[in-house]
């Protein structure tokens, strides 16, 4: 079973901003906070990111932040990249890590099938 720990402790809000700014720059898109979602998402992230949680909960936190839309563009890509980076904290073969990165990216983006979501849950709970 994958341990409960502060998966996002090394990702302060400034790093979330940097991730989004980098993605926007690569795509020549406007990097700007939204008036509706930015402050709420920032407060949620800052109150949650140091907390110990299951990997499934950390991925769900990223999914929820994507849905809250703190930035004008690339919210999904921003939080999916952060979620995929958590996979590097696991001792996995390169093939398993690639599969898991793909799964968490799809979950955060909201495009994972029920089967993919179940596969991720089972992976996180296996001995």
Q: What residue ranges belong to the model's regions?
A:
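FIC/Doc superfamily catalytic core
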Residues: 1-127
């Amino acid at each position: 079973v994958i341990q409960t720990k502060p998966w996002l402790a090394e990702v302060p809000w400034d790093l979330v901003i940097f991730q989004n700014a980098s993605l926007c720059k690569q795509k020549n898109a406007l990097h700007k906070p939204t008036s509706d979602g930015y402050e709420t998402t920032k407060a949620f992230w800052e109150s949650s990111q140091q907390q110990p949680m299951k990997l499934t909960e950390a991925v769900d936190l990223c999914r929820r932040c994507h849905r809250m839309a703190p930035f004008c563009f690339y919210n999904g890509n921003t939080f999916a990249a952060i979620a995929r980076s958590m996979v590097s904290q696991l001792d996995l073969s390169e093939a398993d890590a690639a599969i898991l990165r793909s799964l968490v990216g799809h979950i955060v983006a909201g495009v994972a099938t029920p089967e993919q979501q179940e596969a991720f849950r089972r992976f996180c709970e296996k001995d």
